Amino acid sequence: MTREDTFEMPRPYVICHMGMSLDGKVTGDFLSLTQCAAAVDAYYQVNRRYAGDAFACGRVTMEGSFTQGFQPDLTPYQGRTVPPMDYVADETATFFAVAFDRRGRLGWQCGRIEDEDPGYGNAHVVEVLCEGVAPEYLCYLQHIGVSYIFAGNEAGVLDLDLALFKLRRIFGIKKLLLEGGSILNGAFQREDKIDELSLVIMPCVGEEQDKPLFWQSALSEYQLEESRLINGAPWLRYVRKR
């Protein structure tokens, strides 16, 4: 029996799953190095092995990995009013891509992730927004079939407890893979919402400007539960000491 099997909280069990350089960086050109190819493949293998109900990323990570900077034309929706209420576009979805996009800036083109990797492909998109997002953007999301929830105030301050509660209650998400970037990882870590750490170590050192695993972290303790080599890359699994 795994830790998530006995997890009893009104939120998903959160696993922060990241590929990390030897000096603790999670973004940068090192991820495209030939020397790191086997470790990157190991990262995706572990992702599939976890078989989460959802994966979650911040706006910058989602933009770089999936929306590719697309900016939708919102002029057809200007002047429309939309009540600031949570919206479920697909009540039959069982696998989700959760985008923490406080201001509503991501340019999705449809309501599902198109990717050949089964760890990501066909995931239904759920936007986590703060209050005050433009109504024309909400209309656009509804038009293309993207779900959204509100969990934060108009100043852009995210209410992580509320977001996780809604993800569990509305969408039934029990196991959530948190996959960056460092700002979102740090927000989860500071609020003690990371139950498990899964780290695949890349055989390289990042550059000074590359981002760390956690941005503005707080002191916390984890216990090593498992370690092994996958494709020659070290995989370390830690659980939170509570």
Model-predicted regions and their roles:
Residues 2-242:
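Enzymes that bind and transform nitrogen-containing heteroaromatic metabolites
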